[in-house]
């Protein structure tokens, strides 16, 4: 919640202050998304502060870079609980109000890790330890399209997107995916925010069930002029092709 509570830079308090200072309204709830009771508390506190939930962004994720042969079962289960079960629980919690209003949007954040290596033989067989994260994000993409079909009749959008390029954050810097927060190879966080807004606000029939990539979808709808990265220069996951 506070700066210094975690080894990574940043805090919920800082984020809330930045939103409020820029003219928005925000409140922070420290919660463990792998726990159902905590998920329900997040929704109840959001409703108490702002009313019924119109848009749910499932952005929380957990990753450990460990080869399967060495992966502790407890960590595997915890990561899936955050990456897959959390979005299910939160979506289930907000759906009754959305169904009653016949409107709403659920946007899930996936990752290029959902793109598998394909079948062998493998010229590059270096162990990177990304099996769990990729599997959980692939599950989230399948969950997205299945839920989109279920709630389509109620006028609710469900969509999913990944960053087209690695977004510099304290976490991606820590894992050496980018060299720093100002790494020019990275994707500005603002593009992720715009893509989430696009999927939550464009007409249902144009976006629901989409599994896409930030710059791909922004360029498709004319929100940006130039695009690069996954979904543009490189083929996305299987679910993004259907």
Q: What are these model-derived regions, one by one?
A:
Residues 19, 67-68, 75-77:
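Substrate-binding pocket helix/loop in short-chain dehydrogenase/reductase
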């Amino acid at each position: 919640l506070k700066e210094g509570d975690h080894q990574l830079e940043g805090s919920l308090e800082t984020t809330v202050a930045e939103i409020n200072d820029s003219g928005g309204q925000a409140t922070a709830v420290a919660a463990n998304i792998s726990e159902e009771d905590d998920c329900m508390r997040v929704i109840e506190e959001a409703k108490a502060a702002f009313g019924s939930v119109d848009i749910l962004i499932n952005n929380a994720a957990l990753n450990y870079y460990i080869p399967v042969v060495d992966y502790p079962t407890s960590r595997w289960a915890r990561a899936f609980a955050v990456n897959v079960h959390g979005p299910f629980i939160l979506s289930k919690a907000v759906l009754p109000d959305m169904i009653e209003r016949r409107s709403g949007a659920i946007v899930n954040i996936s990752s290029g890790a959902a793109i598998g290596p394909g079948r062998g033989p493998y010229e590059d067989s270096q162990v990177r330890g990304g099996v769990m994260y990729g599997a959980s994000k692939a599950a989230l993409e399948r969950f997205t399209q299945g839920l989109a079909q279920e709630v389509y009749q109620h006028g609710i959008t469900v969509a999913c997107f990944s960053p087209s390029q690695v977004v510099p954050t304290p976490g991606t810097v820590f894992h050496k995916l980018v060299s720093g927060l100002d790494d020019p190879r990275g994707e500005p966080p603002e593009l992720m925010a715009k893509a989430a807004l696009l999927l939550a606000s464009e007409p249902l029939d144009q976006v629901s069930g989409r599994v896409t990539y930030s710059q791909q979808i922004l360029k498709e709808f004319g929100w940006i002029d130039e695009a690069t990265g996954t979904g543009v220069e490189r083929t996305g996951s299987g679910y993004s092709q259907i």
